């Protein structure tokens, strides 16, 4: 099912709560707004947030001869989405599975979803380096995945976990497309001034240390946060904000025009 996909991008984070799913979702929307056919696969089995972020909660998936049919976001149906969140009754339902069952589900997501022809598939992964990540890497061995984007925050604790993520990528042979530093500063909703409320520059320093590109720095912007649950792209709703400019730059770095 992956052989018809031109580009496969993984989005990783060493720690939870760094905004990885938001970056994944907005990157997928940015690519779709650029005219590309895009798939977004959420394999965070225990904490699927993509359906909520795109305003797709309550949608059901069904099967065809080729496998599961993804849920489409937007009237133009340029963004196809698959998540375990579509298979759960509600957001409060917990996924309490052992490793083998998680592995089997991820393999199904990667092998049995009828994506059809896509320009890009963005894979939103769970935090850390667990069985789920190893399964993804094994399933992608037969295809030419572009590589991984690693999301971090400026705090030292998050950066420590990202160092492990960098090591994981190198050991499993997945290329690192770059590092994104998220939640670096707070944008005032009244005057748009960005104040450094945490430390900053950690993502840049880590990228230099790991000898990989630094793809950009994203602030905490309440206007961007308000888009959660709407399915709207930041690049169209807030075209001049820092987040939009960084997203466009990332899209360009992975070949999107």
UniProtKB/Swiss-Prot annotation:
CDD domains: Mrp_NBP35
SUPFAM superfamilies: P-loop containing nucleoside triphosphate hydrolases
PROSITE patterns: MRP
Cofactor note: Binds 4 [4Fe-4S] clusters per heterotetramer. Contains two stable clusters in the N-termini of NUBP1 and two labile, bridging clusters between subunits of the NUBP1-NUBP2 heterotetramer.
Residues that bind [4Fe-4S] cluster: 188, 191
Homology family: Belongs to the Mrp/NBP35 ATP-binding proteins family. NUBP2/CFD1 subfamily.
HAMAP family documented for this protein: Mrp_NBP35, NUBP2
SS bond partners: none
Top-level taxonomic group: Eukaryota
Subcellular location: Cytoplasm
A molecular function (GO) term: metal ion binding
CC annotations in GO: cytosol
Cofactor: [4Fe-4S] cluster
Keywords assigned by UniProt, alphabetized: 4Fe-4S, ATP-binding, Cytoplasm, Iron, Iron-sulfur, Metal-binding, Nucleotide-binding
Binding site for ATP: 14-21
Designated name of the protein: Cytosolic Fe-S cluster assembly factor NUBP2 homolog
Any single biological process term in GO: iron-sulfur cluster assembly
Job description of the protein: Component of the cytosolic iron-sulfur (Fe/S) protein assembly (CIA) machinery. Required for maturation of extramitochondrial Fe-S proteins. The NUBP1-NUBP2 heterotetramer forms a Fe-S scaffold complex, mediating the de novo assembly of an Fe-S cluster and its transfer to target apoproteins.
Organism (species): Culex quinquefasciatus (Southern house mosquito)
Keyword field contains Nucleotide-binding: yes
InterPro entries in alphabetical order: Mrp-like_CS, Mrp/NBP35_ATP-bd, NUBP2/Cfd1_eukaryotes, P-loop_NTPase, YlxH/NBP35
Subunit structure comment from the entry: Heterotetramer of 2 NUBP1 and 2 NUBP2 chains.
